[in-house]
């Protein structure tokens, strides 16, 4: 009997434990769910609930329905890449190596804007979960907890990945929002540079070049494009200097192309 219960744990056959919470770390029924949400005491993965605010979905009409904001695809991708980079870099620098980070593009309240950060070590994840609960982001408190999700292949909507999901943003499986190829190359090359620095202490950290339109970064405040959504602790001086150097290089080096610009 014990072997059978263990074999069905977290599956649809399990009538005691919530399979959605086990697979996705979130359930649309929340505390009203008739099945148990077994919150892990240790895990590699930290969930930051509803952290990312998509400008295209943030506007609502009087009846509460979503309105599509007038934001171009290019602006949307830049806004998202900046958000992703800031969270990824700060969490990896502060808490430890990140294996993967995923952001949900769903619209359901239990999944919208959820950020899942899978650390290499469980101790780093525990430290991050505890510390981030004392942080603010975009004028809102951060709600973090350890998540049971470690295999995102089981949590993702396969139909969405093939462009065939009929539930749109209200699907109960993860619709993951992709980052640009440029940012992906930067984050992985950054990791290689970090490992190289451990062998050569004198090397400095680089920073990804960002092509921002004049005035957009300081334009809308809050959760819109260019709204300055940063974790509300001071950045270390080195990162600030690196960004300043990037701006100087862009002024002196002329405009680059889009996509995977010539820097890499």
From Swiss-Prot:
Residues 44-149 form the RRM domain. It is found in: Nucleus. Belongs to the splicing factor SR family. One of its GO terms (biological process) is mRNA splicing, via spliceosome. Residues 253-264 have a biased composition (Gly residues). Residues 190-219 have a biased composition (Basic residues). The gene is U2af38. GO terms for molecular function: mRNA binding; poly-pyrimidine tract binding; pre-mRNA 3'-splice site binding; zinc ion binding. Necessary for the splicing of pre-mRNA. Binds to the polypyrimidine tract of introns early during spliceosome assembly. It comes from the Eukaryota. Its main location: nucleus. InterPro entries: Nucleotide-bd_a/b_plait_sf (IPR012677), RBD_domain_sf (IPR035979), RRM_dom (IPR000504), RRM_dom_euk (IPR003954), U2AF_small (IPR009145), Znf_CCCH (IPR000571). A zinc finger (C3H1-type) spans 12-40, 151-178. Residues 233-251 have a biased composition (Basic and acidic residues). This is Splicing factor U2af 38 kDa subunit. Associates with a 65 kDa protein. One of its GO terms (cellular component) is precatalytic spliceosome. Keywords: Metal-binding, mRNA processing, mRNA splicing, Nucleus, Phosphoprotein, Repeat, RNA-binding, Zinc, Zinc-finger. The keyword DNA repair does not apply. Residues 190-264 are annotated as: Disordered. The modification Phosphoserine is found at residue 19. SUPFAM superfamilies: RNA-binding domain, RBD.
């Amino acid at each position: 009997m014990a072997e059978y219960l263990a074999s069905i744990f977290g599956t649809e056959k399990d009538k005691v434990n919530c399979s959605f919470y086990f697979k996705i770390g979130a359930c649309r029924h929340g505390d009203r769910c008739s099945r148990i949400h077994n919150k892990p005491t240790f895990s590699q993965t930290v969930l930051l609930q509803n952290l990312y605010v998509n400008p295209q979905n943030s506007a609502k009409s009087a009846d509460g329905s979503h309105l599509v904001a007038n934001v171009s695809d290019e602006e949307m991708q830049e806004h998202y890449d900046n958000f992703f980079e800031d969270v990824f870099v700060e969490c990896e620098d502060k808490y430890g190596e990140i294996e993967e980070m995923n952001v949900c593009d769903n619209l359901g309240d239990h999944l919208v804007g959820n950020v899942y950060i899978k650390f290499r070590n469980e101790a780093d994840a525990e430290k991050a979960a505890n510390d981030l609960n004392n942080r603010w982001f975009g004028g809102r408190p951060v709600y973090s907890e350890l998540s049971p999700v470690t295999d995102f292949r089981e949590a993702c909507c396969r139909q969405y990945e093939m462009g065939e999901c009929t539930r749109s943003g209200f699907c109960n499986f993860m619709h993951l929002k992709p980052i640009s190829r440029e940012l992906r190359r930067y984050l992985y090359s950054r990791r290689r540079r970090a490992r190289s620095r451990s062998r050569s202490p004198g090397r400095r950290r680089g920073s990804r070049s960002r092509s921002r339109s004049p005035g957009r970064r300081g334009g809308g405040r809050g959760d819109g494009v260019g709204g300055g959504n940063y974790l509300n602790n001071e950045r270390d001086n080195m990162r600030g200097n690196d960004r300043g150097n990037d701006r100087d290089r862009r002024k002196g080096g002329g405009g680059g192309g889009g996509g995977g610009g010539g820097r890499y």
